[in-house]
Amino acid sequence: MARKYFGTDGIRGKANIFPMTPDFAMKVGIAVGVLFRSKATSRRVVIGKDTRLSCYMLENALVAGFTAAGMDAFLLGPIPTPAVAMLCRSLRADIGVMISASHNAFYDNGIKLFGPDGFKLSDEKETKIEALLDSDISELPLANCEEIGRAKRVEGDIYRYIEYAKRTLPRDVRLDALRIVVDCANGATYKAAPRALWELGAEVIAINDEPNGFNINQECGSTDLTSLRNKVHEVRADVGIALDGDGDRVLMVDEKGQMIDGDQLIAVIAEHWHKTGRLHHKGIVTTVMSNLGLERFLSEKGLKLIRTDVGDRYVVDMMRQKKYNIGGESSGHIILSDFCTTGDGLVAALQVLACMKESQQPMSQLCKRFEPVPQILKNKVVHNKNVLQKSEVQAALTKASEHLGKEGRLLVRASGTEPVIRVMAEGDDRKAMTAIVDDLITLIARHDHD
């Protein structure tokens, strides 16, 4: 059954437009508080946020809702999403909340929820929350006046996260002699990432580390590598790291300024962990968007690749089911379950840097683990995502899939967070893949206005 408020990564929308309004955010706080409060627990919620302007508004609204439901709110301030997941466990909270729209522009915002185990909530839990959200607010059982919650700002939380990230490396691993440019996307990692790298011994040049509420993900971070590439060239850095607005994804560039996507980063970590006996069950989990070249590379090494729907929560679910400890997406969500319950851009980057130090290879050599199969991906903004269900569109999709056969892949899907349909064709013939994608985009555009 389609969900009303939750997408693939929480509740998301434009700030001050439903559902990202203060009144609805307060109701979310009440509903989640009612569902998770228990007399057997501390009735505690941790709330983090990124650096967009509307976070102040939504944070206060959520605090009002949670405290009205009888929960104490621990406010973390601007902090990466994986830090919220970690601190949810560390502070023994009943629920964790991250206010962020990830890689989106400042005018969007969202609410991500984590359970007491640090994992994102299940579909079943989100369905229960939606049922409460659809009820009248006067029907929700608020706390009595003696049990109203309190709000408290947590001191030093960012330094706890930095230590946690550093501890994912062996104590003898240092990053001395590495010149690293880190692009913080003017987002939640602007303090933690440069500091962690510096404490590990690297020479750090931080860019896009001055958030002002509006510039998060603005021509920077993992969605736009231009400024990172330019700075790497300018300072002759060994490597560049691009994080997104909430720090749960990472892309990198080598010393030549060439992009290293999530698939290549996963390949580096998986190969190293396999050689050192750390890879569980000889396999990894990715999504349907990961390149066929990665699958071929792993197969040659006797490793399995399991694909899921797009969304790191689905990757994590499959990892838990199969007991795998590496998973991720080509977009840069990389989940290393030995350390993390969700994607962590800083931790993933540290593992790659450790491989770089051990191999003594330049980044351009280390991260060329496989030759990507040509993959043409285009996005089409639509008014109605149900355009994919129209008979002529369905027929065209079937025909294109049959044409590709076993020599390629076709993926057409509606985004879970944006009014966009993504069309991807993958195969060894780039020209043919481009033609297939262009034809389908044209067809979708025509029927979107029918």
Curated annotation (Swiss-Prot):
Keyword set includes Nucleotide-binding: no
Residues with PTM Phosphoserine: S102
GO cellular component entries: cytosol
Residue positions binding Mg(2+): S102, D244, D246, D248
Active site, renumbered: S102 (phosphoserine intermediate)
Cofactor binding annotation: Binds 1 Mg(2+) ion per subunit.
Catalysed reaction, written as an equation: alpha-D-glucosamine 1-phosphate = D-glucosamine 6-phosphate
InterPro entries xref list: A-D-PHexomutase_a/b/a-I, A-D-PHexomutase_a/b/a-I/II/III, A-D-PHexomutase_a/b/a-II, A-D-PHexomutase_a/b/a-III, A-D-PHexomutase_C, A-D-PHexomutase_C_sf, Alpha-D-phosphohexomutase_SF, GlmM_bact
Alphabetical list of Pfam families matching this protein: PGM_PMM_I (PF02878), PGM_PMM_II (PF02879), PGM_PMM_III (PF02880), PGM_PMM_IV (PF00408)
Family per similarity comment: Belongs to the phosphohexose mutase family.
Function: Catalyzes the conversion of glucosamine-6-phosphate to glucosamine-1-phosphate.
UniProt xrefs under NCBIfam families: glmM, PRK10887.1
Identification of the protein by name: Phosphoglucosamine mutase
Species per Swiss-Prot/TrEMBL record: Bartonella bacilliformis (strain ATCC 35685 / KC583 / Herrer 020/F12,63)
